[in-house]
């Protein structure tokens, strides 16, 4: 379940245990039952290869960029669309057959994406590749189930990883990109 963060709309995205991804537009105008006055509009964004239970729905830089993860064995667990769900790309790459619980894209470098799995945190710096290369990013954390990933933008984009039974860990994206570039000469200071 996720709501696209737009103050002028109320679009709700719902993932089911059966692998369906539903979009509810005008969700704030929904009324229960078979009410003809309900203005909520339901549509399916379910991909043809969606099998298993949806564990997370996240957005990229706009509402058309959607990341969906599944937490089952023996299936593809990471899907991405940049066209609002008209078509989906599988992004498991070299990831072992492990359930994926959550996903988070670096807002400063869209190529860098991290996932929370049954065996800790994994990352890629080439998400747009047809077969992204995933690497472990545990940084002192054991092979523990990650239940959620969150980003605190006001704290230099600090990432928090909630675990099953071992508390919460925090770190930063591993991007090589600097947050800020400063240059100066004798007469001026430039910040990019």
Predicted regions and their residues:
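Extracellular glycan-interacting surfaces
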Residues: 1-182
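Short, solvent-exposed loop/edge segments of extracellular or virion-exposed proteins
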Residues: 181-191
